[in-house]
Amino acid sequence: MPHSAYIFDFDGTLVDSMPYVAMGVKSFLKSRGVDYPENIMEIVTPLGYPGSADYYNEHFGLSTNGEEYLEYVQNLIYKYYQNEVPLKPGVYEYLTALKARGASLAILTASPLRFVRPCFERLGVLNLFDHVWSCDDFSMTKSNPEIYLKAAERFALAPDQIAFFDDSIHSLTAAKAAGLFTVGIYDETAKAFVEQMTKTADVFLEDFRNIDHI
């Protein structure tokens, strides 16, 4: 049944940006001479930029920090968010339908908001959102159930009145623990977790087409 509010992840959920993010991550690691595993994006995506830098230092012997890493990746891929990154199939139609029926919408992302706003302005959807939140606004990651409870407070709603969409098993697990209705979204970079997401999320979808029942 329809909910009162909807929270969406950004990268890999609403926009098909993960190939660009992966390019930036792998370029950074190559520039440091790191022989990274094939599933590096599955490992670091839930960590955010500071957490990813910590992971590289611990596992690859680097001595980088989150700001240095963020600056490198941002400078490399920012232009793609401004000019190329597209919405995933059915996203525009779904978001406009939600607003038409009076739902409140929010973004909750580990990505810098300087990526989100110009991308959504270009795609014509920024004005559909009541809130655009970064994890930094809550001082915690999306792997922490508390962040969803704090978001619910900002909506002045109970958690079970909110639907949450993400392509990350870690975020979906945390949101479900917080009591939100969870919707897993397929993304190529997270395909190894499809079985887990199908079991964990209340609903798992290939894309946003024909989902007006949620």
Predicted regions and their residues:
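N-terminal helical cap/lid subdomain that shapes the substrate entry/recognition surface
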Residues: 2-97, 101
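Asp-based, Mg2+/Mn2+-dependent phosphohydrolase catalytic module
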Residues: 1-4, 96-99, 113, 117-214
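Residue-level detector of anion-binding/catalytic polar loops
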Residues: 35, 104, 181
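Conserved SAM-binding loop
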Residues: 14, 87, 105, 140, ...
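Short, flexible loop segments at the rims of nucleotide/cofactor-binding pockets, characterized by
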Residues: 81-86, 110, 182-184
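Conserved phosphate-coupling serine/threonine residues in phosphotransfer and NTP-handling enzymes
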Residues: 13, 109-111
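Short "lid" loop at the C-terminus of a central beta-strand within the Rossmann-like core
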Residues: 46, 112-113
